Curated annotation (Swiss-Prot):
Annotated localization: Cell inner membrane
Family stated for the protein in its record: Belongs to the TatA/E family.
Organism of origin: Pseudomonas fluorescens (strain ATCC BAA-477 / NRRL B-23932 / Pf-5)
Origin organism lineage: Bacteria, Pseudomonadati, Pseudomonadota, Gammaproteobacteria, Pseudomonadales
HAMAP family on file: TatA_E
The protein's name in its UniProt record: Sec-independent protein translocase protein TatA
UniProt KW keywords: Cell inner membrane, Cell membrane, Membrane, Protein transport, Translocation, Transmembrane, Transmembrane helix, Transport
Short name of any one Pfam family annotated for the protein: TatA_B_E
Gene this chain is encoded by: tatA
GO molecular function: protein transmembrane transporter activity
Length: 93
């Protein structure tokens, strides 16, 4: 006899089913199962040797030139349309 006897586990299981319902527990089990499958598949794919990557032919890269920016004294504007946001209605008032 430990802290949790089999009778305790039955009571806990009944309470969990009453609180969450069988549909949510089924969905939770399905989601956990799919996550485990995805994890195992990713682990198996990781063990397979990757295809060797062939480096592209060496081509000269032109030097990067800085872009011309607007003078600092001009204001920066964003051209978007404003949208009206309504306050949510409270149920208790």
């Amino acid at each position: 006899m430990g802290i949790f006897d089999w009778k305790h586990w039955i009571v806990i299981l009944v309470v969990v089913v009453l609180v969450f319902g069988t549909k949510k527990l089924k969905n939770l089990g399905t989601d956990v199962g799919e996550s485990i499958k995805g994890f195992r598949k990713a682990m198996n794919d990781d063990e397979k040797p990757a295809e060797p990557v062939v480096p592209p032919a060496a081509q000269p890269v032109p030097p990067v030139q800085p872009q011309q920016s607007a003078p600092l004294n001009q204001p920066h504007t964003i051209d978007v349309q404003a949208q009206k946001v309504e306050e949510p209605t409270r149920k208790d008032s």
